[in-house]
């Protein structure tokens, strides 16, 4: 064991352990330099020991310092060009301006902080607008540490925010309504302009087609005159003036009736009906074999196509004119132009030359029920065929144009009726006025020197409705007076006058009802009462204003007397009743004199007398249990008459009416008690 204790893994000799001295008290900083230097003579030893000792410089040399110097002194050559090696370019980073940081969102959703222990929580408007807001959690987080006063302040702030939001919503609704009305007017105006543009484009297309056809056919001969009917007008007759056009058309139809037997049965006389072309002689062909069947003659009218057969006149017939022509025309078929289709048969291919030659100058008339007839000109390559086809197309186009115009006029009239009726359902009850709306849709009225149509009246009605809805009564009354003045000035336009009066009167009733309700609520304020009565008088509802005001004052008397409670002192109770009655009557008469015209004062006096009579009934009922002309009875009567003297200040003397016929009042005497079957 002793040998093992002598064995050690450390190499070399063991050094002697350092000796640690006991701690010493340091009275000053340790000197960094010259610590063993003795103090100067005459110097304070404490100052000498307080001087700092400089730190010795680091030792130079060493392996580590050489490596560090060599590392920092190494140079690296910069490459001339750095290649990306074909890597794609760096994608563009998205902008973070559109994204809100999480801290901001969290802070926005947190309940509002409180500035102090005595201040109510501030309402976070942005947090309230959050669609995912949960009210229970929001209130719990905001008012978790709030006091009763802070909760009340927070509730009042919420009410203010609610009121402000309601006001903003109402203003937004009215602004949207105004913009909607304005946009509707612009859309209606644009619709009318587009309709006019469509009509102009249609007319331009028709005129352009006619000009091209006329230019293409200018070198062809014009259609011949009616050979058999000499009265039918020729091309020279068509050059007559427009004033004689109706007479010319009438003479054409008379000549047609005379020249074509039975034509009046198919073509009765109508306004504007005239002959467009006498196409001359034609031959009717068989539909299957294309063989000739009989001789025909075609007449084209502006709205019909007449086919007449040519027959020989019998010379030995009774009443026959020997000097007349040998051939006569008999009406065979007649179709409206819009019900038939005229097809050129020259475009149909035929195998045989004879068939092709026959159909080269033929047309097919396809009528109602797919019934078709083929007609060929007598003369080969007769220009009447091309002219007939051209005139048929032009006549059909004119008819369709007329139908479109008529349909658009009817639609416009129907739109006008629907427009006015939809805006005012009460107009449907005015059948006479509703039937004339299509006639007055384009009527112009003079307003302040300018011509306006009835749509302007509708715009004024819209503004009036807005004023009534917003309770701008002064503006509404002024607008009503303006419209009534315009209606009175339309002496030559009875229909427009009735229309405006109907619209204005309907709004007047609604406006008067609203002002009447306000009058009943504010009858105790003389200024507001005078203003409301003035509005109703200007609207022509002074009777309604008078009745509403007096009814409201009667209700006030009834309510005030119900507040008087009898507590055993009859004299005090009669004093309160008489004071309420005569003071309210005094104030009512005084306000009535300042608000209503003098001719209506009789109604107010009658109302005051009725109220005094009602007071006498109550007085007689209360004094019926007292001794007649006793002390209590006398005191109550004197007090009532003293209060009745208030009416003398407004020009009424009802003192003699107080207690009148009081002794006539007899209370109902109750009989003796009646038992069960015993009297």
From Swiss-Prot:
This is Exocyst complex component EXO84. Involved in the secretory pathway as part of the exocyst complex which tethers secretory vesicles to the sites of exocytosis. Plays a role in both the assembly of the exocyst and the polarization of this complex to specific sites of the plasma membrane for exocytosis. Also involved in assembly of the spliceosome. Belongs to the EXO84 family. InterPro entries: Cullin_repeat-like_dom_sf, Exo84, Exo84_C, Exo84_C_1, Exo84_C_2, PH-like_dom_sf. The keyword Nucleus does not apply. Residues 1-123, 214-237 are annotated as: Disordered. GO terms for cellular component: exocyst; transport vesicle. It holds the Pfam family PH_EXO84. Component of the exocyst complex. Keywords: Coiled coil, Cytoplasmic vesicle, Exocytosis, Protein transport, Transport. The keyword Transit peptide does not apply. It comes from Gibberella zeae (strain ATCC MYA-4620 / CBS 123657 / FGSC 9075 / NRRL 31084 / PH-1) (Wheat head blight fungus). GO terms for biological process: exocytosis; Golgi to plasma membrane transport; protein transport. It comes from the Eukaryota. Disulfide bonds: none annotated. SUPFAM superfamilies: Cullin repeat-like. It is found in: Cytoplasmic vesicle, Secretory vesicle. Residues 142-208 form a coiled coil. Residues 74-84 have a biased composition (Polar residues).
């Amino acid at each position: 064991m002793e040998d093992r204790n002598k064995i050690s893994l450390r190499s070399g000799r063991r050094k002697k352990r350092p000796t640690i001295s006991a701690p010493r008290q340091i009275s000053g900083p340790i000197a960094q330099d010259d610590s063993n230097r003795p103090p100067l003579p005459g110097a304070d030893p404490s100052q000498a020991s307080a001087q700092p000792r400089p730190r010795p410089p680091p030792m130079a040399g060493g392996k580590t310092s050489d490596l560090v110097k060599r590392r920092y002194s190494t140079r690296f050559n910069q490459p001339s060009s750095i290649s990306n090696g074909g890597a794609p370019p760096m994608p563009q980073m998205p902008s973070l301006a559109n994204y809100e940081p999480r801290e901001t969102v969290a802070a926005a959703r947190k309940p509002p902080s409180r500035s102090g222990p005595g201040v109510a929580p501030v309402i976070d408007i942005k947090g309230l607008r959050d669609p995912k807001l949960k009210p229970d959690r929001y209130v719990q987080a905001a008012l978790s540490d709030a006091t009763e006063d802070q909760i009340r302040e927070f509730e009042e702030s919420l009410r203010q925010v609610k009121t402000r939001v309601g006001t903003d919503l109402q203003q937004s609704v009215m602004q949207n309504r105004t913009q909607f009305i304005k946009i509707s007017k612009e859309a209606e105006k644009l619709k009318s302009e587009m309709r006019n543009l469509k009509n102009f484009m249609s007319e331009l297309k028709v005129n352009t087609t006619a000009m091209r056809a006329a230019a293409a056919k200018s070198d062809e001969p014009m259609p011949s005159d009616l050979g058999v009917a000499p009265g039918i007008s020729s091309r020279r007759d068509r050059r007559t003036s427009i004033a004689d056009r109706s007479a010319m058309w009438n003479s054409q139809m008379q000549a047609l009736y005379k020249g074509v037997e039975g034509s009046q049965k198919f073509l009765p006389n109508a306004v504007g009906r005239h002959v467009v072309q006498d196409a001359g002689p034609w031959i009717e062909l068989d539909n299957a074999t294309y063989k000739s069947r009989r001789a025909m003659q075609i007449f084209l009218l502006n709205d019909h196509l007449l086919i007449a057969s040519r027959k020989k006149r019998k010379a030995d017939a009774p009443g026959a004119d020997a000097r007349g022509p040998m051939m006569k025309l008999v009406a065979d078929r007649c179709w409206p132009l819009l019900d038939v289709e005229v097809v050129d048969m020259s475009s149909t291919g035929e195998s045989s030359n004879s068939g092709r030659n026959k159909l080269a100058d033929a047309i097919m008339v396809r009528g109602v029920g797919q019934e078709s007839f083929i007609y060929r000109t007598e003369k080969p390559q007769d220009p009447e065929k091309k002219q007939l086809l051209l005139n048929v197309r032009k006549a059909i186009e004119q008819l369709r144009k007329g139908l479109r115009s008529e349909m658009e006029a009817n639609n416009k009239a129907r739109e006008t009726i629907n427009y006015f009726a939809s805006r005012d359902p009460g107009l449907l009850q005015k059948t006479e006025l509703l039937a004339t709306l299509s006639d007055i849709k384009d009527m112009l009225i003079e307003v302040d020197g300018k011509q306006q149509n009835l749509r302007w009246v509708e715009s004024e009605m819209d503004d009036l409705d807005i004023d009534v809805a917003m309770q701008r009564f002064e503006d509404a009354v002024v607008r009503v007076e303006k419209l009534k003045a315009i209606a009175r000035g339309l002496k030559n336009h009875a229909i427009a006058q009735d229309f405006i009066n109907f619209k204005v009167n309907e709004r007047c009733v609604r406006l008067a009802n609203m002002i009447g309700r306000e009058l009943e609520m504010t009858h105790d304020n003389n200024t507001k009462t005078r203003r409301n009565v003035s509005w109703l008088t200007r609207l022509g509802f002074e009777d309604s204003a008078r009745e509403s005001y007096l009814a409201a004052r009667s209700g006030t008397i009834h309510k005030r007397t119900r507040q008087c409670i009898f507590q055993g002192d009859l004299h005090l109770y009669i004093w309160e009743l008489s004071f309420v009655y005569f003071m309210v009557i005094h104030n009512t008469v005084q306000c009535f004199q300042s608000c209503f015209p003098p001719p209506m004062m009789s109604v107010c006096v009658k109302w005051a007398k009725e109220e005094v009579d009602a007071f006498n009934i109550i007085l007689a009922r209360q004094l019926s249990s007292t001794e007649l002309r006793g002390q209590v009875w006398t005191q109550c009567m004197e007090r009532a008459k003293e209060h009745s003297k208030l009416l003398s200040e407004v020009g009424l003397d009802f003192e003699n009416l107080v207690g009148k016929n009081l002794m006539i009042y007899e209370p109902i005497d109750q009989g003796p008690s009646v038992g069960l079957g015993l009297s």
